[in-house]
C-alpha cells in the first residue's frame, strides 16, 4: 500500500458520522490536492469495513461511485442523518466535514 493510499484511509476514517467530504477535500487533506480522481479509485476499490467510504462524495454533493451500489451508499448516509435526494446530498454546507475550519465560540448574552 502506497503512502498516499495510507494517508487517504487515515483521512477517511476521521470523517465523523453524519458528515461527508469530497474526493477533492480528501485528496487535499492527504497532501495531494490534485488527486481527487485517485481518491475516487481508492474508495471504489476499498473493501475495508473500518473505512467509511460512503462518506466520501463527488463535488457539488453528487454521490459519486461506491464499491457497493449507489442505493447502499444512499441508505448508509441516510442512516447517519445525511439527507440525500436523488443522487445528491442536501444541506451540503451543514454536513460537509472540514477539519481545517476552526470553530468559533459564541459568546453568551
State where each predicted segment sits.
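Nucleic acid-binding interface residues in structured DNA/RNA-binding domains
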Residues: 1-109
Amino acid at each position: 500500500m502506497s503512502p498516499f493510499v495510507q494517508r487517504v484511509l487515515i483521512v477517511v476514517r476521521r470523517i465523523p458520522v453524519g458528515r461527508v467530504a469530497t474526493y477533492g477535500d480528501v485528496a487535499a487533506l492527504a497532501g495531494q490536492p490534485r488527486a481527487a480522481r485517485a481518491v475516487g479509485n481508492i474508495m471504489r476499490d476499498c473493501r475495508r469495513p473500518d473505512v467509511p467510504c460512503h462518506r466520501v462524495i463527488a463535488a457539488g454533493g453528487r454521490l459519486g461511485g461506491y464499491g457497493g451500489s449507489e442505493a447502499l451508499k444512499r441508505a448508509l448516509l441516510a442512516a447517519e442523518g445525511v439527507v440525500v435526494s436523488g443522487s445528491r446530498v442536501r444541506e451540503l454546507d451543514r454536513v460537509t466535514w472540514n477539519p481545517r475550519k476552526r470553530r468559533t465560540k459564541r459568546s453568551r448574552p
